[in-house]
Amino acid sequence: MFDTPAVFARITEAAAEAADNAALRGAVVAILRDVQNAGRAAIAEGFAEDPFAARPLTRAYTYLTDGMVKTAMYVASEILHPLATPTQGERIAVLAVGGFGRGEMAPFSDVDLLFLTPYKITAWAESVIESMLYILWDLRLKVGHSSRTVKDCIRLGRDDFTIRTAMLEHRFLAGHAPLARSLDQRLKSELYKDTQREFIEAKLEERDARHRKQGERYMVEPNVKEGKGGLRDLQSLYWIAKYIYEVKETAELVPLGLFTPSEYRTFVQAEEFLWAVRAHLHLVTGRATEQLTFDLQVEVAARMGYQDRAGRRGVEVFMQKYFREATRVGELTRIFLTKLEAAHMKGAPLLERIFRRRRRIKQGYKVVRGRLDVVDPEAFLADKLNLLRIFEEALRTGMLIHPDAMRLVTANLDLIDDGMRNDKEARRIFLDLLLKHGNPERALRRMNELGVLSAFVPEFEPIVAMMQFNMYHSYTVDEHTIQTIVNLAQIEKGELVESLPLASSILKAGVNRKVLYVALLLHDIGKGRPEDHSILGARIARKVAPRLGLSKADCETVEWLVRYHLLMSDMAQKRDISDPRTVRDFAKAVQTTKRLDLLTVLTVCDIRGVGPNTWNNWKATLLRALHAETKRALEMGMEALNREGRGNEAKKALRTALSDWPAGEVKTEIARHYPPYWQGFNVETHVTFAEMLRQLEHSGDPGGIEIRLDPDEDRDATRACFAMADHPGIFSRMAGALALVGANVVDARSYTTKDGYVTDAFWIQDAEGHPYEAARLPRLSQMILKTLKGEVVARDALKSRDKIKKREKAFNVPTHITFDNEGSDIYTIIEVDTRDRPGLLYDLARALAAANVYIANAVIATYGEQVVDSFYVKDMFGLKYHSEAKQRTLETKLRKAITEGAERAAAS
């Protein structure tokens, strides 16, 4: 790896031939680069053969880097700047600090060096350090360095915990060894002594700040080094242990009683896995990359040997392993800190600094440093129901469970058997955890982390730490499930009345809470298998719900909710809910207002539980409208959806709104529109189009174009209204104009008039998913107008915009195209499910226009990198596409448009 005698021999030879110091330094760099490249290649080759063997890799990189640093020091101090008789002040010691000092080097880790001098730095020492650094920089090493005296180290370490931590792991490399020993002694006697609590508090605050910045361990693009449950958390444990106990290896924590042998094995397993992932990240990217982004997850999973299997991609199996290891790191942290508290700390507990009002605890429990612990482990385990009761007691008292009690529970999960799962009292306790205390997520999350939830509901185990490899879901499946229950509990407590008025009013009026909570717990339990997760989940729910003690009627409702938990979301986001047929079909599926209310609340909780930014006013508006229309149909009968009756109501509302218009003009305006127009828009939009059409007629310009851009706050979007003379392909031209200005279309409706005009409304958002700022609207309007007038050709101008971001290329999004002639009385619905990209709607609309397809509406639903565009269409004769041959022809054209666009995007 690094043959020191051979390297020194080559350097001696080069020194004899070098004309000057600059030439010698160049020769040394060339020699070391050869060794570096050969060493890196050998390490990478060995790691590829054994992709989980992180320890040999980190040690090998440390050894290789040690060799280069020591050689650079030798060359700088003995050849480039030799001193025949150095004075007492002309001494220097080179120390590795931080991760390098610990001997843990990833392929592109920083090389942190401390140049230690006895007194103020001399000119000779400065020259040596400078020459050393130039050699290391020329080797493309990322060197972090500082030059200090021993006194400086003590002074700076007192005020800066980052410096103190780095020095905690110093390791002598080269130079004057007695100087390094002096630092070691003085750090212990002057800096570390009697400051343990201060150091621990600082490390915990640092950890909390890091976690706040990086997010939960369940976030699906975790930072392997800095994220929650990552390497830095494990390193923090080691730093604290070293600071207090002066340990050199983690194994020494076992005889000290801080870890059991089993916990130590867990530590080693987690550390080895996380280091392997980090090393692969560095090798894949060729730099110090710590964020496990989607594109890198695929590559790292492949390098580590994870393969696709039925229903799941290899990358999903890999990430499930990652999240499970991150969870174990969290458990180890809790155990370690609690042991430290018991042995060393006074005052408030380290894990829980919040004052809590004490409640009397039940017999068999005790309070240890503010946490709930077990008095007698044997007596506790004698009644296996205590493995559930402890979570109930923790919720009742508001206390955290002591890690010793957690250890006891985890070590005895085998007590949770079929007998216990079918025990009436066990069912009662479990349902009370969900329903009784107002914060079920606290119990569920801890039960999940300790394995109790999967032991009591074994069907839950496959989704624990399961990642869904897409950009839509921000959490693992189990954490998403818990987030949905958090949402329901918050709505129940009245905390979301303003943001979720409909769901809040439904719960206030009263629903079957037990059914809702159990349905949410089970709604995604079928994920990760080849079968549709809703169908499989319903079958699983049919087994689990009775076991949890639900009545036959409640079991049927839970099963129905799990089977159709996506129905309302799909109807609202993928279909035109102003079409009576959509509401009629949905009402037939739901059948009762009771089920409608339950499904509405479940849908809201589910969407909000997907991630921080998935819920918005647009989705809220769609769901509220679908709920209102469906409820009306269920209560008043399907005739309430009569198109003619609803049209008359809309016309009456417009007459009232245009009361200041001459009667003749109002009559003309109402007469010019076909029936679907009246249900497609609200009265405000009808007024806008009336004014725009009036303006067009008054202008006398046959090529006139009217554009209105207005904020639609209810929908978190900007409404873009267009009115002009109708001609073929107008919808695709407008879609192109909007794509060109970078607008994301979230909904679109197009209606022709009897007198030759077209009225189109597009709801658009900016690249961040927000309505456009008012100040941008005039400029936006001008740019759109230029495109519509042909001054800019959208097809050509869009070529440079068709780009897919690197991290999105990892996703495999197959294209599915379906034709639905039952979902609308008037139109064929073409549903295109494919990868989203800029300009996709325009490409699809242009392909349909070229095939003489009339597009009435386009409903757009986006799920991260995936989009579902639903087009309501007729042929040129106003008929549906019933012919399978015509459907196949259209599908071919649409697939061609998608493929060509994807190729453009990949090439750009």
Curated annotation (Swiss-Prot):
CDD domains: ACT_ACR-UUR-like_2, ACT_UUR-like_1, HDc, NT_GlnE_GlnD_like. Pfam families: ACT_ACR9_3rd, GlnD_UR_UTase, HD. The keyword Repeat applies. Residues 477-599 form the HD domain. Uridylyltransferase (UTase) activity is inhibited by glutamine, while glutamine activates uridylyl-removing (UR) activity. It catalyses: [protein-PII]-L-tyrosine + UTP = [protein-PII]-uridylyl-L-tyrosine + diphosphate; [protein-PII]-uridylyl-L-tyrosine + H2O = [protein-PII]-L-tyrosine + UMP + H(+). The keyword Ion transport does not apply. Coiled coil: none annotated. SMART domains: HDc. Its EC number is 2.7.7.59, 3.1.4.-. Residues 361-718 are annotated as: Uridylyl-removing. PANTHER family: BIFUNCTIONAL URIDYLYLTRANSFERASE/URIDYLYL-REMOVING ENZYME, BIFUNCTIONAL URIDYLYLTRANSFERASE_URIDYLYL-REMOVING ENZYME. This is Bifunctional uridylyltransferase/uridylyl-removing enzyme.
